[in-house]
From Swiss-Prot:
Biological source species: Mycobacterium paratuberculosis
Family: Belongs to the transposase IS1111A/IS1328/IS1533 family.
Pfam families assigned: DEDD_Tnp_IS110, Transposase_20
Alphabetic keyword roster: Transposable element
Signal recorded as keyword: no
Name of the protein described by the UniProt record: Insertion element IS900 uncharacterized 42 kDa protein
Membrane-spanning intervals of the chain: none
UniProt GO molecular function: DNA binding; transposase activity
Keyword Transport applies: no
Alphabetized InterPro entries for the sequence: Transp_IS110-like_N (IPR002525), Transpos_IS110 (IPR047650), Transposase_20 (IPR003346)
Top-rank lineage group of the source organism: Bacteria
GO biological process per UniProt: DNA transposition
Length: 399
């Protein structure tokens, strides 16, 4: 006999645990299944058989990562799939009997929550370009973090060896200074080589302003004649770090090129780029965070809630109208919206006017930028809904 069933999946990397319940919360299936296509297809078939023609609702606590294969198979099979964040499962577990925590219990809680709740977000087939952008932007973030970790230790040993050279160059921005460190790290080495040889070394490696950089380096070297303890070992470390940073710069550039190529192929690229403050990277991060499909967000308010730009009430008793920042939101989406708003203040007069107005109202800088980001998100959502590019507001002077 046909019956509706709910299948809760506690997802993992190597395997998943599935619990299937009926309308009375009776357990029909409890099974651990390997994260393998054949095993997952068998599980889907088994759950479908249990329903015997009734509606099957799947719920899972991951929307990417180890659950990607199962999600793809369920969507391809036309199954209804809901997403329950792990934080929600954790808090819901407190309302169930017992303090124990097992994969089976988590899967049962996920299935039961899917059975009772009607506000869970369905998972849809991802936009291929948005999925690729999510991978690339995540990789870019890792590379930038690696570069930051490398450049900071690079500065500290260099400061101990040649503090004057450290003050003369910004290694975070000057590629020529990094090239210099791959060949010369100590005052003695710079003085022995001389300005002409150092400049030739830089020109051979296509450094910009080679003569100026060489002259600055020699001036710094002539200002320090003392030998610092551990100087030779520190010089070796500095040279390796400089090469590492340069290699990371190359990889970041290659990643940026791949991001731009894919982003410009997306149907929303032209619309997003027309919005002041959005460039290729921030636009790609926006698409990666939203999935590239505004149909998933019924309104601009819903999108703002996901981005963490919609304040939530914290009322209790006689206290009302107490609005706070939400705790659960997409950090990547908020970052893209916040940074684009920050850029638009410098490039767009209307954004600057709105920001200044919020500042005169007593808002702090961060609060004013967040308010601007919320306003811009409303506009961007409407633009994507109507497939219209941004047109600055124009005013007509009175005659």
């Amino acid at each position: 006999m046909a019956q509706p069933v709910w299948a809760g999946v506690d997802a993992g990397k190597a395997d998943h645990y599935c619990m299937v319940i009926n309308d009375d919360a009776q357990r029909l299936l409890s099974q651990r299944v390997a994260n393998d296509e054949a095993a997952l297809l068998e599980l889907i078939a088994a759950v479908t058989t249990l329903a015997d023609g009734g509606e099957v609702t799947w719920a899972i606590d991951l929307n990417a990562g180890g659950a990607a294969l199962l999600i793809a198979l369920l969507i391809a099979a036309g199954q209804r799939l809901l997403y329950i964040p792990g934080r929600t499962v954790h808090h819901a577990a407190g309302s169930y009997r017992g303090e124990g925590k097992t994969d089976a219990k988590d899967a049962a809680i996920i299935a039961d929550q899917a059975r009772m709740r009607h506000d869970l977000q369905p998972l849809r087939a991802g936009d291929d370009i948005a999925v690729e952008l999510r991978i690339l932007t995540s990789r870019r973030s890792d590379l930038v973090a690696d570069r930051t970790r490398a450049i900071e230790p690079n500065a500290r040993p260099a400061a101990g060896i040649l503090s004057a050279l450290e003050r003369a160059f910004d290694y975070n921005k000057s590629r020529a200074a990094l090239i210099l460190l791959t060949g010369y790290q100590t005052p003695d080495a710079l003085r022995s080589a001389g300005g002409a040889r150092v400049a030739a070394f830089l020109r051979k490696r296509k450094a910009r302003n080679a003569d100026t950089v060489a002259a600055t380096a020699l001036q710094a070297a002539n200002a320090q004649h003392s030998i610092v303890p551990g100087q030779q070992l520190a010089a070796t470390v500095v040279a390796r770090l400089a090469k590492e940073v340069m290699a990371l710069d190359t990889e970041i550039g290659d990643t940026d090129a791949m991001i731009e190529e894919r982003f410009r192929r997306h149907r929303h690229a032209e619309i997003i780029l027309s919005m002041p403050g959005f460039g290729v990277i921030l636009g790609a991060e926006f698409l990666a965070a939203t999935g590239g499909d505004m149909a998933a967000f019924a309104s601009a308010d819903r999108l703002a809630g996901v981005a963490g730009l919609a304040p939530v009430p914290r009322d209790s008793g006689r206290i009302s109208g107490n609005l706070k920042r939400p705790r659960r939101y997409d950090r990547r989406l908020l970052r893209a919206c916040y940074l684009s708003a920050l850029v638009s203040i410098r490039t767009d007069p209307s954004s600057r006017t709105y920001y200044d107005r919020k500042r005169t109202e007593g808002k702090r800088h961060t609060q004013a930028v967040l308010a601007l980001a919320r306003r811009r998100l409303n506009v961007l959502w409407a633009m994507l809904r109507d497939h219209a590019v941004y047109h600055p507001a124009t005013t007509t002077a009175a005659a």
